[in-house]
Amino acid sequence: MTSHYTILIQWSEDDQCYVVSLPEWGDFCHTHGTTYAEALANAQAVLELLITSAQDKNEPLPPPQLFGRSLQMA
């Protein structure tokens, strides 16, 4: 499933893992992984569950956050 939602991945020294935030889905939508790849895979799985659940309940999906400007290549 392709989605255009934001996935923020940061290393946590306190937790010794990568912590993931999915900001369009609220303040409490997080997951984690011991590696960056695992954190990303977990985030994609959570997003798929959130999207499927909302669609099954006929609930609107939150709008994706858009990057506010064009990228320029160096």
Task: Please place each PLM-identified region on the residue numbering.
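Acidic-residue sensor for enzyme active/binding pockets
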Residues: 24, 38, 48
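A short, exposed loop/beta-hairpin motif centered on an aromatic-Gly-Thr core
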Residues: 27-38
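Short aromatic-glycine-(Arg/Gly/Cys) micro-motifs in beta-strand/loop hairpins
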Residues: 10-26
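Short, charged, surface-exposed hinge/linker loops at domain edges
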Residues: 1-6, 42-74
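Short glycine/serine/threonine-biased micro-segments
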Residues: 24, 31, 56
